């Protein structure tokens, strides 16, 4: 399986293959998950002091905080996958 990388803001790169979920940080269960990840040393803060807009959960149980909207991250994820599919079909990745 090829490794796909996704930009989650400020030049921070995450392996797209390892992402399980991209969720909003607003709900209490997610906030609790962030706190628990911090306690376990599994929290990666990639917000650069900005407001957390997306919480990315990986298959290794890491919790990544991003200042990018969940939809934006998801869109990048989807367009990366589409680029992989259309790689040899003359599609230049434009919407």
Curated annotation (Swiss-Prot):
Highest rank taxon of the organism: Bacteria
Family in the record: Belongs to the RemA family.
Protein name: Putative regulatory protein Daud_1598
């Amino acid at each position: 399986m090829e490794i796909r990388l996704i930009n989650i803001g400020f030049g921070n790169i995450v392996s797209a293959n390892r992402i399980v979920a991209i969720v909003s940080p607003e709900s209490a269960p997610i906030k609790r998950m962030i706190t628990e990840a911090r306690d376990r040393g599994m929290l990666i803060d990639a917000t650069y002091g900005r407001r957390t807009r997306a919480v990315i959960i990986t298959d290794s149980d890491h919790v990544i905080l991003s200042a990018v909207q969940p939809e934006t991250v998801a869109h990048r994820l989807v367009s990366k996958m589409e680029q992989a599919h259309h790689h040899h079909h003359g599609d230049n990745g434009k919407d």
